Amino acid sequence: MNKRPRKTNMSQPLLTLVATACALAFSPLAHSRPVTLTAQLKNYGGDGAYLAAYLMDAKGVYVRTLWVAGGKAKYHKHLSDWYKLSAGDAKRLNGVTGASVGAGRTLKVTADLADALIDAGYEIRIDAAAEDMRDSPSEVRIPLSKANAGKPQTGKQYIQSATFQLQ
C-alpha cells in the first residue's frame, strides 16, 4: 500500500496567529503610553546618588525596573528594596541604566507603561543611596494614578521631589 504524505493547510495556523496578534494589539492591555518620571535631588552634600525606579503591583509584588541611575553594579545592593525584589529578574538592567545623579541635580526618564496599570493600584517606587551616607530604601512611593500625575511627592532623605507625567 502506497501512503502519500498528508497535505496540510498551512494557512489555517497562520490565520489563527494573525487573528490572535490583532486581538492583542487592539485590546486595552496592549495600549501603552509614555510616563515621564522626574526626581529632583536635594543638595545633601555628598557624591552622586544611585537611584532605582521600579514598578510594584497592587499586592506589593515587583513588576519591573524603570530605571537605575549609577552604573557600578557593586553599589546596587545599597538600593536594597529594589535589589531584593528584582533579584530574579534577569532583564532588570536591560537598557535602563545611566550615570549616578549629583546632589541638587535632576533625573528625568521616560518609560512606556500599559494604560491598564494606571488607576489599578500600581505604584512607582524609588530607592536612593549615596557613598558614605545612609541608604534610603523606598525613598519615594508614588501611586500610579491619573490623580497623582504631576503632583510632587517628597522623599525621605535624598529626593526633594518626585513626579510623573502621563503623555
Predicted segment positions?
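Boundary at the C-terminal end of the N-terminal hydrophobic targeting segment
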Residues: 30-32
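Short amphipathic, basic-aromatic surface patches that mediate peripheral association
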Residues: 34-45
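Structured domain cores in non-transmembrane regions
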Residues: 58-120
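Glycine-rich, aromatic-bearing surface loops/beta-hairpins
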Residues: 113, 119-123, 128-167
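Exposed beta-strand and adjacent loop surfaces of beta-rich binding modules
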Residues: 34, 48-52, 121-123
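Bacterial N-terminal signal peptides that target proteins for export
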Residues: 2-18
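Beta-strand signatures of extracellular beta-sandwich domains
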Residues: 52-56, 67, 125-127
